[in-house]
Amino acid sequence: MHQMNAKMHFRFVFALLIVSFNHDVLGKNLKYRIYEEQRVGSVIARLSEDVADVLLKLPNPSTVRFRAMQRGNSPLLVVNEDNGEISIGATIDREQLCQKNLNCSIEFDVITLPTEHLQLFHIEVEVLDINDNSPQFSRSLIPIEISESAAVGTRIPLDSAFDPDVGENSLHTYSLSANDFFNIEVRTRTDGAKYAELIVVRELDRELKSSYELQLTASDMGVPQRSGSSILKISISDSNDNSPAFEQQSYIIQLLENSPVGTLLLDLNATDPDEGANGKIVYSFSSHVSPKIMETFKIDSERGHLTLFKQVDYEITKSYEIDVQAQDLGPNSIPAHCKIIIKVVDVNDNKPEININLMSPGKEEISYIFEGDPIDTFVALVRVQDKDSGLNGEIVCKLHGHGHFKLQKTYENNYLILTNATLDREKRSEYSLTVIAEDRGTPSLSTVKHFTVQINDINDNPPHFQRSRYEFVISENNSPGAYITTVTATDPDLGENGQVTYTILESFILGSSITTYVTIDPSNGAIYALRIFDHEEVSQITFVVEARDGGSPKQLVSNTTVVLTIIDENDNVPVVIGPALRNNTAEITIPKGAESGFHVTRIRAIDRDSGVNAELSCAIVAGNEENIFIIDPRSCDIHTNVSMDSVPYTEWELSVIIQDKGNPQLHTKVLLKCMIFEYAESVTSTAMTSVSQASLDVSMIIIISLGAICAVLLVIMVLFATRCNREKKDTRSYNCRVAESTYQHHPKRPSRQIHKGDITLVPTINGTLPIRSHHRSSPSSSPTLERGQMGSRQSHNSHQSLNSLVTISSNHVPENFSLELTHATPAVEQVSQLLSMLHQGQYQPRPSFRGNKYSRSYRYALQDMDKFSLKDSGRGDSEAGDSDYDLGRDSPIDRLLGEGFSDLFLTDGRIPAAMRLCTEECRVLGHSDQCWMPPLPSPSSDYRSNMFIPGEEFPTQPQQQHPHQSLEDDAQPADSGEKKKSFSTFGKDSPNDEDTGDTSTSSLLSEMSSVFQRLLPPSLDTYSECSEVDRSNSLERRKGPLPAKTVGYPQGVAAWAASTHFQNPTTNCGPPLGTHSSVQPSSKWLPAMEEIPENYEEDDFDNVLNHLNDGKHELMDASELVAEINKLLQDVRQS
């Protein structure tokens, strides 16, 4: 007994694992066995262990969950979602679950979650029977009546016992208590049920014994074995000669399961030869027939018709075995028995059944899946079945609805509905699907079932603004809390996923948080102002609005930029910033001698507004009734309209209004107190102005301070640079005595090569040559200082007279003629060039008559020549005309004077070759290029015949540097084919030449003669000796930039220039050899020449001549003029 109980409580579990070959979705078929009546909660299996090999193929096996798709509403088994543990959820009674079916099992499916990697496991749990039921009889006392004349072997069917168990636990055998007259035989029906028949084994004798009580026992073979019993009470009746008899002892009938109720199954016919009551037969079911048979069939007691009382079902009961008896009505009647076996024939009478197992609890016809799930996401599990057999039970399943879903068969008649595409709820939120199951019977039967798939929303859409940038305008001076605008973002998601909340992202404007300027309603996106906006403070506010949904687990956001432009209003009056005001009043001083148009002051005003609101205009509204002042409305400049000398008043009060052009216009009035002051009172006025300027703002003071600092630094830099240059020049000072005394001890220097970069000539075309006095003073400890100063003054007067001579000659140069004179050329050489070009016919003096006046100025200053000086090479050699110039060199002026200078003044009326093309129109309209450009001789290849080299060396200038470029010393002059002209042949043309003089030359010489004949020669005792050059003056003479372009001089001038400037000094500091040193320069030139103005023109010179005539200076003849010019040139040459 102990072993039997242990077996009942032992959980026998085993699994039959079948690897799926249909699709990856179907993982395995799992089969387990358990005994019925197990304790609730008993564990049957753990899927996480049994299907571990399948789970390992998934991306995240540790996160897999299990869900059971139960069939029916009775959850006998429970599946744990975490580990797939299968346990008993309720007491399982196999007899109740499967009745007498030999195979009893519970089938369900388990899927894995999430469904993106769905795996389907088919679970079958077979319930095993235990012997928990004993066989039982329907009656505890079974009465049986037998005639004493019954023959041996007569069989009487007995009531069957019922045992709900199956197999060995079901009814196995019957037994009858021991006796000598009766025995039993156990027989099996077509349905497998066992029954017993009572058999007469000996003849009966009623007189001996009229009744028997025997115990009928039914037992099984279970462990432990169980049994049930009933009492047979057998009565022996008197003999009845004849008993009814059936034609056959048994019948087999085929019954279609779809046969209607009332169908006649069998017409029983029993016969009895007796007559009367003994021959009348009554039909009935045997006493041991089960109630189920009595409910399904019906027998007519008189006619013996067996009819169908209840429709049969092949799928429930495939056959029936009925015991029928016939008995007459006579006394001691003995019934006759007949067995009828009814076999139910299957027909296609059952439509396929569709069972859709959805994951949505509570709603069988709606399946929920999430949008965005991948393809092959699980939707539903479909199981179809047909109770029919054969072709009638074979089913074809189809899915109708939408291409986004598909039907996939797993095993037997089980199908999966999976997604065939990624779904988007925002496009379509619901799908209606139809499952059709159709069998293969004839005619075919089908079943249709509908269900709905609803798409659950996920937070897959961020809020969306219509624009990425919103621009709005708002006027300044708004009220706090004023509504500005609304920005809205839409979110197509549902619920909290589509609930949008608005915020302004943190930013700063002028150091303040944006949240102090504007705010936004988080629910609807309405933007409001938090403060009064000022266009002058902030003209534009830019901030970012963020829209955030309420989705989970992650909220989605989007941004948009909002730009608020603050429109300017005319809310600021003009503010006057100059002149300085005190109590809105400014004091302005005007000098007494101010003429009309004198600039009195300028009113400077600003307006913090913008656009037309800041456009200002000024006007005098009071105090100017006599129009003494005028004001420019745009610049606000105030000028005098009349001369202040003619105004009787000394003080005015002008009311000036400054207004903008806004709407409405705003203005500011200022009062200007204008006062006339004398020059003597300028100091007081300046003091008053200083007091008024004290009210300048801080920024102006800072600017003035910075300017003063910069000025001080600049002065320091200039002083430092000057000192450095002076120290540098200490070693470069030249003393003629020292140089000449030491020069003879030095070896002879080689001739310096002439470079093209050294030749620097700047033409003056109708230009101005400035004339300014240049006073030099150099402190010296030499005993000859006083004489040097006297010589310097005399040199100055001589230079000025000579410059005047150049100015007179230059005035007669035609305007279309390029006069090749440079500022760097000494006055002596300029005169020589003019005379040489005049002699060679390279230009003709412009006629001096009133009808052809040109407004031209020729300025020439001897001191300005020093700016272009190329002297001071560091060796002591200097340029002509300078105080340290070496007088030992030959000058072409000496040659000029010695070889017939007086020939220049021969005016015999001869016309030079260069004037042959002139016409009478030249006197009225001026000379043309054809007049002043005669055929010239071929230029010489010798650069010394065509170029003028001012000095041997070019000092380096700060602005430009001219690198030395060597020229060949042995350059041979080309044969010009024409005899060179020199000062020895000046004015001496061949007899075949035309006359060289003309009226223009006579006019020039006449004017020169008129000037010099009125000069009185002064007396000068001695010439001053050479003195040391002042270093500071030498520095000033070198300030000017060197000309950048070299121009060749005429052939004749270049010849003596080149021959003179490359001679080495050989004499002491006395007059040059070959000069008329005994002739004293006449100083009666000097006062006359000093009266010639700097801006010399023809009319000016005429005035000088008239002035000289009025002074009654005595006249000089031509020869005296020549002598005076000779003295002048020698004086300048020596100085």
Swiss-Prot record:
It comes from the Eukaryota. Interacts with DAB1. Its main location: membrane. Glycans are attached at residues 103, 269, 420, 559, 583, 641. CDD domains: Cadherin_repeat. GO terms for biological process: brain development; cell adhesion; homophilic cell adhesion via plasma membrane adhesion molecules. Residues 1-27 form the signal peptide. Potential calcium-dependent cell-adhesion protein. One of its GO terms (molecular function) is calcium ion binding. Residues 869-878, 1028-1039 have a biased composition (Basic and acidic residues). Residues 769-800, 869-889, 942-1003, 1023-1046 are annotated as: Disordered. It is found in: Cell membrane. Residues 721-1135 are cytoplasmic. SMART domains: CA. Keywords: Calcium, Cell adhesion, Cell membrane, Glycoprotein, Membrane, Repeat, Signal, Transmembrane, Transmembrane helix. SUPFAM superfamilies: Cadherin-like. One of its GO terms (cellular component) is plasma membrane. Residues 28-699 are extracellular. It is a single-pass type I membrane protein. This is Protocadherin-18. PROSITE patterns: CADHERIN_1, CADHERIN_2. Residues 28-137, 138-246, 247-354, 361-465, 466-576, 582-688 form the Cadherin domain. Residues 893-1135 are annotated as: Interaction with DAB1.
